[in-house]
Amino acid sequence: MNLREKYGEWGLILGATEGVGKAFCEKIAAGGMNVVMVGRREEKLNVLAGEIRETYGVETKVVRADFSQPGAAETVFAATEGLDMGFMSYVACLHSFGKIQDTPWEKHEAMINVNVVTFLKCFHHYMRIFAAQDRGAVINVSSMTGISSSPWNGQYGAGKAFILKMTEAVACECEGTGVDVEVITLGTTLTPSLLSNLPGGPQGEAVMKIALTPEECVDEAFEKLGKELSVIAGQRNKDSVHDWKANHTEDEYIRYMGSFYRD
């Protein structure tokens, strides 16, 4: 698909440095779009930007922003002003393991800013642009933790639930227009963060067998864009959600999700 012809000249990836964000950068560049890449680690972004320019022959723009800090969204808006924007994906996330009372408020506030406030500011801003021009696309990234809840990782799951439900609603509102909106919900994904914390032995091998690559997740997201409002990445994840909803109570599902994070 020529994404540039369909949606516009520039795409914006929020949380672009590695993993799923990097895969989104490569995907839209392969579709002919120039890429605005936003993240905290400017040096890594510059390396990725150079690779994308060389491989795909598109323009890139690197923006350093910490989504946990006030003003981060406004930094992004200023960097994209005047560009022909046609795509946005919010990939960034922040989590902290532990009980609500054991997590410092400052950490809670940072997670709210990343997972809710900056997300919504960016979604609102670029949806206004896309709606006004009746052209554009959004793919936001949620998590299986947002489908049920995520004990001992509670605020992360709640934030992902917000992204999931907010994007689903907007996707429905956009049906029949020139703007395509979708949320993709990810399960275990082979990101650098996962690989660096992967346990050894049979447990690690089991994770590797079920995990999807970032590229597989992004490919499925684009395959379903404009066709489905809400996508669960991978057949195994789809089957798992269907099984738990059909054959278990909500309490059982909550306790099951908590078993992944409880000490």
Curated annotation (Swiss-Prot):
Instruction: List its uses.
Output: Could be a useful biocatalyst for the preparative production of ursodeoxycholate, an FDA-approved cholic acid derivate drug used to treat cholesterol gallstones and current sole alternative to surgical intervention.
Q: Out of the domains of life, which is the source?
A: Bacteria
> Which sites bind NADP(+)?
T17, E18, G19, V20, G21, R40, R41, D66, F67, S240
Does the record carry NADP as a key word? yes
- Alphabetical GO biological process terms: bile acid catabolic process; lipid catabolic process
Family annotation (Gene3D superfamilies): NAD(P)-binding Rossmann-like Domain (3.40.50.720)
Q: Which residues form the active site?
A: Y156
The answer, when asked if Nucleotide-binding is one of the entry's keywords, is yes
Q: Which residues form the signal peptide?
A: none
Which GO terms fall under molecular function for this chain's record? 7-beta-hydroxysteroid dehydrogenase (NADP+) activity; nucleotide binding
Positions of the record's site feature: Transition state stabilizer: S143
Description of pH dependence: Optimum pH is 9-10 for the oxidation of ursodeoxycholate. Optimum pH is 4-6 for the reduction of 7-oxo-LCA and dehydrocholate.
- Report the enzyme's class at the first EC level: oxidoreductase
What UniProt notes about the protein's domains is: The 27 C-terminal residues (residues 237-263) are absolutely required for enzymatic activity; a deletion mutant lacking this C-terminal region shows a complete absence of enzymatic activity.
UniProt lists the family membership as follows: Belongs to the short-chain dehydrogenases/reductases (SDR) family.
Q: How does it assemble?
A: Homodimer.
What exactly does this protein do?
Answer: 7beta-hydroxysteroid dehydrogenase that catalyzes the reduction of the 7-oxo group of 7-oxo-lithocholate (7-oxo-LCA), to yield ursodeoxycholate (UDCA). As C.aerofaciens is an intestinal bacterium, this enzyme probably contributes to the formation of UDCA in the human colon. UDCA is regarded as a chemopreventive beneficial secondary bile acid due to its low hydrophobicity; it protects hepatocytes and bile duct epithelial cells against necrosis and apoptosis induced by more hydrophobic secondary bile acids like deoxycholate (DCA). This enzyme is also able to catalyze the reverse reaction, i.e.
Name-wise, this protein is 7beta-hydroxysteroid dehydrogenase
Q: Which organism is it from?
A: Collinsella aerofaciens (strain ATCC 25986 / DSM 3979 / JCM 10188 / KCTC 3647 / NCTC 11838 / VPI 1003)
